[in-house]
Amino acid sequence: MGAFLDKPKTEKHNAHGAGNGLRYGLSSMQGWRVEMEDAHTAVVGIPHGLEDWSFFAVYDGHAGSRVANYCSTHLLEHITTNEDFRAAGKSGSALELSVENVKNGIRTGFLKIDEYMRNFSDLRNGMDRSGSTAVGVMISPKHIYFINCGDSRAVLYRNGQVCFSTQDHKPCNPREKERIQNAGGSVMIQRVNGSLAVSRALGDYDYKCVDGKGPTEQLVSPEPEVYEILRAEEDEFIILACDGIWDVMSNEELCEYVKSRLEVSDDLENVCNWVVDTCLHKGSRDNMSIVLVCFSNAPKVSDEAVKKDSELDKHLESRVEEIMEKSGEEGMPDLAHVMRILSAENIPNLPPGGGLAGKRNVIEAVYSRLNPHRESDGASDEAEESGSQGKLVEALRQMRINHRGNYRQLLEEMLTSYRLAKVEGEESPAEPAATATSSNSDAGNPVTMQESHTESESGLAELDSSNEDAGTKMSGEKI
């Protein structure tokens, strides 16, 4: 069985809630992946004396969902019940927990749950080789604690801008690379021993068996980075998401898109669903999960924004009808053709950060109404190509996501030239054999044929584009 389905699974899991002056919504979609390996946690009011605290997290599993699912249920308990976390609470209430104790307790909780899961029989005997990233926030009345282990990401939107982002843990990062090499490993094609695309994770015990090294000195470390930030009146929202989201949207793009959607709807589940759909239409091939946490100062629904959004929908509906009427004599155009025509137009008031992909559902609804016999699969534009042509487009798209500078410009030109040739009926270029190197390469990998956690299925990536946005943009104290 391959890593991808023939058609994406677009059914979504949703949840929402409110409390402690917060509102949250979440959405997750399996997408093109054969399995759903993401999980999440959302707790408003932490039990046992922390009722005015809240905890949210996203877990991006790889090589299976075992670790991600267990962590989503038990990580918070491992954090709040260990002695390091509770040390300061002995003298008073939860409000008196010191910042350092909370941060140390979070770190201890990660190490303890990783040690605990190692004893599971299926993980111990190698029957299950899964692992998971974890990104979360613990929100107290005065502080926000950002927690990250892996390459999922959290961002804080404050006073109309992205003011903080967690840093992705990639093998190519100098600090991570040094630890990997000190443990006897190597970094090849941006991966640990040429295979695993994250340098910190829970689980992944095949990468945590170097004799004489502690748990935080292994090829893959379970140690999280913890940042503490004082809450402010200007705080608007926090986004937690896996790399299936960040692969196709930058920090700023996603935050601007979310802000624009909050101005047209106060339903946080809907906003999260729009994000997931938009990322699918932008070409994400991974599982997708997002948790949106809104503070009291989050953007409110605006009559003007609602009006502009409605006018945009009507304009798009009208244009789709016109395009299909003009093409009537030549036969019904496919949806990809309609999208290409619209993408070449200067359409005002498209959702910032989302662009035309953010209105794909509107366009597709009109197209399906006018062409009821079409088999809709919810795929992105590239996925509507067939056979080797579709594979070529996908390979070029994945390379485009993961390259910058001159390489990226070259790939943009290749992709544009290919699409133009197809539209004009010219012969398409042959599919290059080495374009999409398997991400499951086991070169130097202690795990044979394990599905590696990767942001794209191309092993040719020079630089991970998401690192461009990673890292703190504001001085948050880090453990």
From Swiss-Prot:
Regions annotated as coiled coil: none
Gene Ontology annotations of biological process type: N-terminal protein myristoylation; negative regulation of canonical NF-kappaB signal transduction; negative regulation of defense response to virus; negative regulation of interferon-beta production; negative regulation of non-canonical NF-kappaB signal transduction; peptidyl-threonine dephosphorylation; positive regulation of canonical Wnt signaling pathway; protein dephosphorylation
Database matches in Gene3D superfamilies: Phosphatase 2C, C-terminal domain suprefamily, PPM-type phosphatase domain
Cofactor: how bound: Binds 2 magnesium or manganese ions per subunit.
Reaction(s) the record says it catalyses: O-phospho-L-seryl-[protein] + H2O = L-seryl-[protein] + phosphate; O-phospho-L-threonyl-[protein] + H2O = L-threonyl-[protein] + phosphate
InterPro entries named in the record: PP2C, PP2C_BS, PP2C_C, PP2C_C_sf, PPM-type-like_dom_sf, PPM-type_phosphatase-like_dom
EC number: 3.1.3.16
Residue spans of biased composition, Basic and acidic residues class: 1-14
Gene Ontology cellular component list: cytosol; membrane; nucleolus; nucleus
Subunit structure: Monomer. Interacts with PAK6. Interacts with the phosphorylated form of IKBKB/IKKB.
The protein's name in its UniProt record: Protein phosphatase 1B
Organism: Homo sapiens
